[in-house]
C-alpha cells in the first residue's frame, strides 16, 4: 500500500508536475477532446443500432466497448507521438445498464459464458447478460483518456426508447417516467450545480448568500450538502462511490484502494455517511454506538478522504455522481453496493447476476516470481500499460481494430484464451487486482439494526480490495463490517436492486494566466451541452423553492447562463466529423480538429 519515495521525488510528482501551465493544460484539453469525441461516437453507434436502426444488425455491449476503445487508441495516434512517454485509455469503456453501478465491460468472448452462467435466472439483468439493449434501459457510458498522465474522464446516462415505426421519421413514443426518470433528473441537475459551484471558487464574490456567501469559500461540506439536497428532492439516494475529488498527474482515482494517495482532496459518499445521517436523526436513546474511528491502520491521515478542504484555482476536479431511485423503497434503508462474482452454483437466489470482471489494475507494490512462461510474457505487456486499468483485449496484437471482421475476432478470442491462463497466476499472486462489477442494492435499516453481530469489526472481507483508506468498515458506528453487510443483503427478501443514473465530468479551474481570456474561467474538459444532453424524461418530483439551499441552486443556474455578469464557463468541443461509414457492424470514422 505504501512505497518509500524520497522528498525530492514527492515534490516533483505531487507538486511540480501539477502546476497548471499552458503545456499541461494542452494535454488535459487534448485528452478531453478525444474523450468527448469517443462519447459522441459510441452514442451514435447506439442510436444507429437501436433508435434509427440504420445498421444491418444491433451491436452488442461487448462490441460497443471494443469498438470505442479501438476508436480512442486510433485517435490518440494523431497526438503527442514521440513527445510523451505514456498516453492511452484511462478507463476501459464500460456500458452499465440499469442496476449495475459500474465495471461492466465484458470481453468479446464472454457472450456465451454469460448466457450459460445466468441460464434460468429472471430478466432483471437480461440486457446485460444478452448484450442487447432493450427499450427502457438506462445505459451509463463511461470512458477516459490520458496523455502523459493528465486524465480526462466522462460518464453519461442515455435512455433506450421504444420507437414509433409508423411515422416516416423514427421518433420516441414518449418520455421516460417513474423512478428511472427521477434518477436521471437528479444526476443531471446535481452535475450542473456542482460545476457552477466549483466555478465560484474563481470568483468567490458571486457565491449566493444562501450558500454561505464568501465566508469560507467552496468547501467539501458545502458540496456534499448541495448534492444530498438534490438527491432527497428527487427521492433518490447518492450511491456509495460517488465523489467530487481533485485529480493530479497519474492520480485520477483509477486505483483508489491500491494506492493510498497523499494529500487526498475530495468529497466521497460512502455507507458511513448514511449511517451518520440515520444516527443524527434518531430519537432512540438505547442504541449502542461504538466509535471505531481510531481503528484505522493508516498513520498518514492526509490519505483519508475528508470534507475539510477548500477548492482553489489551478486545480483539476473529477465530478462523478451516481443517483439511485428509491421509488420502490417503502421505509428507510441503506443504499450500498454488491460485488458481482463468477462463482456458479452457490445459490438459486432470484435477481442474481453471475459474471467475471473485464478490467484489471496493476499493483506495482506487489512482486512475485511467476512460474508460467505465459504469465511472465503477459506481465511484461501489462507493465507497459502503466497504472491505469486495462482489459486483456488491449494486450492483443489485433488491437485496436481498424475493421471488424470474423478473422480478427477469432484471432482476438485465441489471444484471450492464452491471456486468461496467464492472468490466473498473476491475479492469484496479487500482481493485478480485478476492477469489480457492482450492483446498487437497498437494505432496510431495521434489518441491519436487529441483526446480531458478535464479531463486530473483527471480521474482514479479504475480497474487498479497492477500499479507500479510513473506510474499511462500511458502518463504523454500528460496528458492521463489509462481510457482515454482505450477508445481511442476502438474508432478507426486502433487499432490492436499484436503477442508477450516472454523470461524470472533468473540469479545470483556470486562473487568468492560462485562461483564453483575461478572466479566470472554468474549462469543462468533458461533458456539457454538446455530448451530455439529458434524455427525454419526466419526473414527478421537483426542487422545493422555499428551501434556502434550493434557492442557492437556482441562483447558481442563473449565474451559469449569464454570459456577461455570471460565471465564465467554457466547454471542450468534440472533433468535427468528416465522414462516417457503417456496414456490417464495422465502423470507420475520420476526424479533424
UniProtKB/Swiss-Prot annotation:
Signal peptide (residue range): none
InterPro entries named among the record's database cross-references: Creatinase/aminopeptidase-like, PA2G4/ARX1, WH-like_DNA-bd_sf
UniProt keyword list: Cytoplasm, Hydrolase, Metal-binding, Metalloprotease, Nucleus, Protease
EC code: 3.-.-.-
Statement: the UniProt record of this protein carries the keyword Hydrolase: yes
GO CC annotations, alphabetized: cytoplasm; nucleolus; nucleoplasm; nucleus; preribosome, large subunit precursor
GO BP terms: proteolysis; ribosomal large subunit export from nucleus
Subcellular location: Cytoplasm; Nucleus
Chief location category: cytoplasm
Domain of life: Eukaryota
GO molecular function terms noted in the UniProt entry: metal ion binding; metallopeptidase activity
Note: Present with 45100 molecules/cell in log phase SD medium.
Oligomeric and partner information: Component of the nucleoplasmic and cytoplasmic pre-60S ribosomal particles. Interacts directly with REI1.
Family: Belongs to the peptidase M24 family.
Record's function text: Probable metalloprotease involved in proper assembly of pre-ribosomal particles during the biogenesis of the 60S ribosomal subunit. Accompanies the pre-60S particles to the cytoplasm.
Name of the protein described by the UniProt record: Probable metalloprotease ARX1
Species this chain originates from: Saccharomyces cerevisiae (strain ATCC 204508 / S288c)
Amino acid at each position: 500500500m505504501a512505497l518509500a519515495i524520497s522528498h525530492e521525488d514527492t515534490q516533483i510528482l505531487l507538486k511540480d508536475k501539477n502546476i497548471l501551465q499552458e503545456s499541461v493544460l494542452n494535454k488535459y484539453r487534448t485528452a478531453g477532446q478525444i474523450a468527448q469525441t469517443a462519447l459522441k461516437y459510441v452514442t451514435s453507434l447506439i442510436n444507429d443500432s437501436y433508435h434509427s436502426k440504420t445498421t444491418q444488425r444491433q451491436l452488442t455491449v461487448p462490441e460497443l466497448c471494443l469498438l470505442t476503445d479501438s476508436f480512442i487508441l486510433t485517435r490518440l495516434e494523431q497526438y503527442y507521438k514521440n513527445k510523451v512517454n505514456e498516453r492511452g485509455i484511462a478507463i476501459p469503456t464500460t456500458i452499465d445498464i440499469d442496476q449495475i453501478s459500474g465495471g461492466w465491460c465484458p470481453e468479446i468472448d464472454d457472450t456465451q459464458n454469460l448466457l450459460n452462467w445466468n441460464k434460468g435466472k429472471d430478466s432483471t439483468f437480461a440486457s446485460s447478460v444478452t448484450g442487447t439493449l432493450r427499450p427502457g434501459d438506462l445505459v451509463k457510458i463511461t470512458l477516459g483518456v490520458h496523455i502523459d498522465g493528465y486524465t480526462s474522464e466522462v460518464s453519461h446516462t442515455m435512455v433506450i426508447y421504444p420507437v414509433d415505426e409508423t411515422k416516416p421519421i423514427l421518433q420516441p413514443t414518449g418520455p421516460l417516467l417513474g423512478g428511472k426518470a427521477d434518477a436521471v433528473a437528479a444526476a443531471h441537475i446535481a452535475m450542473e450545480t456542482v460545476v457552477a459551484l466549483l466555478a465560484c471558487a474563481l470568483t468567490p464574490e458571486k457565491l449566493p448568500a444562501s450558500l454561505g456567501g464568501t465566508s469560507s469559500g467552496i468547501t467539501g461540506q458545502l458540496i456534499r450538502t448541495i448534492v444530498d439536497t438534490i438527491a432527497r428532492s428527487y427521492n433518490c439516494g447518492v450511491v456509495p462511490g460517488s465523489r467530487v475529488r481533485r485529480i493530479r498527474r497519474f492520480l485520477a482515482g483509477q486505483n483508489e484502494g491500491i494506492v493510498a494517495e497523499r494529500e487526498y482532496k475530495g468529497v466521497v459518499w460512502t455507507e458511513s455517511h448514511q449511517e451518520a445521517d440515520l444516527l443524527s436523526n434518531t430519537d432512540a436513546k438505547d442504541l449502542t454506538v461504538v466509535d471505531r474511528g481510531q481503528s484505522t491502520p493508516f498513520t498518514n491521515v492526509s490519505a483519508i478522504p475528508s470534507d475539510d478542504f477548500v477548492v482553489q484555482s489551478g486545480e483539476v476536479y473529477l465530478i462523478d455522481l451516481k443517483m439511485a431511485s428509491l421509488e420502490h423503497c417503502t421505509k428507510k434503508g441503506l443504499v450500498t453496493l454488491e460485488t458481482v462474482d463468477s462463482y456458479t452454483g452457490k445459490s438459486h437466489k432470484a435477481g442474481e447476476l453471475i459474471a467475471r470482471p473485464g478490467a484489471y489494475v496493476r499493483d506495482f507494490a506487489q512482486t512475485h516470481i511467476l512460474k508460467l512462461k505465459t504469465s511472465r510474457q503477459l506481465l511484461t505487456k501489462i507493465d507497459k500499460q502503466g497504472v491505469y486499468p486495462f482489459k486483456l483485449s488491449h494486450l492483443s496484437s489485433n488491437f485496436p481494430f481498424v475493421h471488424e471482421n470474423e478473422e480478427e475476432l477469432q484471432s482476438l478470442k485465441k489471444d484471450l484464451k492464452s491471456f486468461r491462463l496467464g492472468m490466473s497466476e498473476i491475479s492469484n499472486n496479487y500482481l493485478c487486482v480485478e476492477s469489480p462489477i457492482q450492483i446498487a442494492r437497498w437494505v432496510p435499516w431495521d434489518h441491519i439494526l436487529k441483526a446480531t453481530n458478535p464479531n463486530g469489526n473483527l471480521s474482514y472481507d479479504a475480497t474487498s480490495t479497492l477500499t479507500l483508506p479510513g473506510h474499511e468498515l462500511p458502518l463504523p458506528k454500528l460496528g458492521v463490517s463489509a462481510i457482515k453487510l454482505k450477508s445481511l443483503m442476502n438474508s432478507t427478501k426486502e433487499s432490492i436492486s436499484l436503477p442508477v443514473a450516472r454523470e461524470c465530468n472533468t473540469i479545470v479551474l483556470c486562473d487568468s494566466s492560462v485562461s483564453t481570456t483575461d478572466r479566470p474561467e472554468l474549462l469543462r474538459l468533458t461533458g456539457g451541452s454538446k455530448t451530455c444532453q439529458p434524455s427525454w424524461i419526466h419526473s414527478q418530483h421537483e426542487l422545493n423553492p422555499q428551501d434556502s439551499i434550493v434557492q442557492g441552486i437556482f441562483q447558481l443556474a442563473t449565474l451559469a447562463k449569464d454570459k456577461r455578469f455570471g460565471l465564465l464557463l467554457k466547454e471542450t468541443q468534440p472533433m468535427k466529423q468528416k465522414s462516417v461509414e457503417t456496414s456490417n457492424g464495422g465502423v470507420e470514422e475520420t476526424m479533424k480538429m
